[in-house]
Amino acid sequence: MKVSSQESNWQKTLPKPFLGFQKNRRLEEVECIIPDLAGMSRGRSMPIYKFTPDTTFSLPISLFYQTISGEYVDMDITNQWMEKDIVLRPDMETAAAVPWADDATLQVINDLELSDGNPLNIAPRNILKNVIDLYKKENLKPVIAPEIEFYLTQPNTDPNEEILPPIGRNGRKGVRQQAYSMVAVDEMGSVIDTIYEYAEAQGLKIDTVIQEGGAGQIEIN
């Protein structure tokens, strides 16, 4: 399949981390994503020939009525089940690689609008933009320090079985009370290396990786 000059031009303007990861592979797919109220990634994927930076498409507003467990909220919401459409508009400044995908894939976070072009006021990104605007009115600039904390575990496909700490390079399970241990971090070296690789591909800068107090408990800043 030939790629049109218009498609080729916008692809050449993608962020440097993406182009560096992409190298000479032909882009196959685009993931258009949004965060829901629980922080879950939702959206649609499409073949590259269906996407341009001006592409818009719709999703039902009811996706914002789902809880973290997939159930729907029990609230008195006017016309809750009319399945009114909301419009997704790509923010190309968020374009990033999807290094865990089998095919060459682009990921783009979208802004959410109503059909009349006004921002959807319950969309997390729009709420955050409103908060930032309040800071600007006071001549202030908010600065954040993101921190991700999680547990590494052994693979577990049976919910009836106990979740166990991962096996390290030395063949032993991780143990507790090893806060800030460099040895404990090194034991998880293959996973940490993959995290660094994926972060670089997405243009994310990692400052530090720390072993916390729990077995397999990792913190990334």
Regions found by a protein language model. Give the residues of each.
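Short, conserved phosphate-binding/catalytic loop or strand-edge motifs used
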Residues: 148, 212-220
